[in-house]
């Protein structure tokens, strides 16, 4: 009998712990088998990676190329650096001066080259980041050199640089009549709300200062209404830089209430259905191009093994299954369209993939060139108070939310996309851009250039078909080509 009660206690403890053990195993199996799916592991590993700096002699011969090829690379890079420095002295000087005081530029400049090459090559080749003007989808630096804009200002530019100038001008002129009116609303608010509700299919709207803030508010509302803490995001997806949705490398805080799961996985759906602590699931439709991987970046050029694969039907089925799982579990499905909003169509990813979210977050694209964040959602999810408990509220404020210039910018953007011309562009976008990508790929193949392009409408990326350690040098070569194009245009 002396062992009876200890055995009972042990058995009881085992029974109580068993569901948690099963739950933990289930969660572990639902994570993507990569560092992107294991935030804490990647964060800890990053702290142990030692510095590696190649010398000038090593930088161009790491692939065992003959000395003649290495010499050509060295000479080409040196020539490019000299040409860019001599052709853009004012731009280079201004950029260097600004980087001493601007922490953002200092950080970006440090990681413009792959880390092992950065210390040596960044001193030789310094590019400009200060611009004089833009026009016709080109950027002009302080020295008059022109560059094609293929980045779209981090996703803001949907309509083209020149299309935004009249929108910004009109919104500024209208905002001047009321000045910095904050706390109230301008007369544009009615048409803006009508337009946002129509395009999103939602009941209510809230305004914020950035896409990151919009996602923060949507998550806060989901937690408020579900009384749960956990967030589900998918491997590789970006939802802004605040702690709860950007775990891992770059965030000094340990991963807290976020699960990073494998997208397009039945195991992820099982986790969502079975747990009772998940408040919301965040989906970035951009991931349809590269499921469970980070968006293509300079670091991807090191290996050149990146391949894009977009299957509209498969991703549609995934979103519909995810929608059903969230509904069954009482979990909010949040579409993060801060980048993708109004690229795939007037109803965004909801219309393109045929799925209805509980809340949609917009930013970047929607304000006609002005900074903004917007949350659109159903009445239940957007309510910030409990009518039966007056002190039970969900707080959200922002001094510059619904700024007159921003609201006017949204109005003019919505008017622009509702024109017959833009409506037709949306209707033909899939065919138009696929034809363009096919034409480029045919040209590359006919000229034996080992690259191809792939994408989703206006969002596209380059794939390298032959492995190389030096694909990233092509970015620098493009700067040299821009320089040559400017000189050629000046001679004509």
What feature does the model see in each segment?
Residues 4-6, 10-492:
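Conserved N-terminal phosphate-binding loop of PLP-dependent enzymes in the Aspartate aminotransferase
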């Amino acid at each position: 009998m002396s062992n009876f009660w200890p055995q009972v206690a042990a058995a009881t403890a085992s029974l109580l712990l068993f569901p948690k053990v099963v739950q933990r195993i289930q969660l572990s199996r639902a994570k993507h088998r990569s560092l992107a799916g294991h935030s804490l592991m990647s964060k800890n590993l990053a702290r142990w990676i030692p510095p590696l700096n190649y010398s000038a002699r090593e930088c161009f011969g790491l692939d065992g190329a003959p000395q003649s090829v290495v010499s050509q690379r060295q000479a080409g890079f040196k020539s490019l650096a000299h040409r860019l420095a001599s052709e853009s002295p004012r731009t280079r000087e201004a950029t260097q001066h600004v980087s001493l005081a601007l922490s953002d530029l200092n950080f970006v400049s440090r990681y413009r080259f792959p880390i092992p090459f950065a210390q040596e090559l960044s001193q030789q080749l310094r590019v400009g980041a200060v611009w004089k003007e833009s026009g016709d989808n080109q950027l002009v630096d302080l020295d008059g050199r022109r560059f094609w804009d293929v980045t779209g200002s981090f996703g803001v530019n949907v309509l083209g640089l020149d299309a935004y100038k009249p929108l910004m001008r009109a919104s500024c002129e209208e905002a001047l009549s009321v000045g910095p009116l904050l706390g109230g609303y301008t007369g544009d608010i009615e048409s803006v709300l009508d337009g946002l509700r129509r395009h999103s299919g939602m009941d209510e709207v809230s305004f914020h200062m950035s896409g990151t803030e919009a996602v923060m508010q949507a998550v806060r509302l989901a937690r408020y209404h579900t009384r749960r803490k956990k967030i589900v995001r998918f491997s590789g997806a970006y939802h802004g830089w605040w702690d709860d949705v950007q775990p891992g490398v770059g965030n000094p805080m340990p991963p807290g209430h976020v699960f990073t799961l494998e997208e397009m996985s039945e195991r992820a759906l099982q986790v969502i259905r079975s747990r009772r602590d998940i408040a919301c699931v965040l989906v970035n439709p951009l991931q349809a191009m590269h499921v469970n991987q980070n968006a293509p970046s300079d670091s991807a050029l090191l290996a050149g093994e990146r391949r894009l694969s977009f299957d509209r039907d498969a991703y549609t089925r995934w979103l519909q299954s995810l929608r059903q799982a969230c509904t069954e579990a009482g979990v909010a499905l949040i579409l993060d369209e801060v980048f993708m909003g109004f690229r795939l169509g007037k109803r965004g990813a909801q219309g393109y993939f045929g799925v209805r979210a509980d809340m949609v977050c917009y930013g970047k694209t929607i304000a006609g060139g002005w900074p903004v964040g917007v949350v659109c959602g159903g009445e239940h999810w957007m309510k910030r108070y409990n009518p039966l408990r007056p002190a039970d509220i969900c707080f959200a404020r922002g001094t510059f939310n619904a700024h007159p210039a921003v609201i006017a910018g949204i109005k003019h953007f919505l008017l622009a996309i509702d024109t017959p011309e833009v409506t037709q562009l949306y209707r033909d976008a899939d065919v138009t851009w696929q034809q363009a990508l096919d034409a480029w790929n045919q040209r590359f193949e006919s000229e034996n250039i080992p690259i191809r392009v792939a994408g989703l409408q206006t969002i596209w990326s380059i794939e390298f078909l032959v492995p190389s350690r030096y694909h990233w040098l092509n970015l620098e070569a493009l700067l040299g080509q821009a320089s040559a194009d400017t000189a050629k245009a000046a001679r004509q």
